[in-house]
């Protein structure tokens, strides 16, 4: 499972970098055509919006991969290691449920419902753009299962702590 996770991490990192670079180019082109040419490009705003959404969702999956999401753990830190493990299992199960129910199922329904709707400025359907949700839902569910099994077998701490905490 570890090689699959590392491979997915690399693909997500690469896709995020490419999409972010594309987003920068799109926005620069949009500003250039609007301010310099006085003829704003019709497609840039729509493409920038959807590119931003895809970058944000892919980055969310990467954060789940690294267990870097926000966690309020000051209460859980007070519990015994056994209770911390139970809480961690419940959290990962909740993440799996949310990812599958909302992102995968809901995302597929949204994509299916919008499949015949065309974007106004781009030659594609809205449903294609909505496919980011189920894709990211599957990735988040995979990462949650990965962390769940790692916590259960003791390979990861029940609560993810910063490796190098910064005290301000």
State where each predicted segment sits:
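Alpha-helical transmembrane segments and membrane-interface helix-loop junctions
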Residues: 1-168
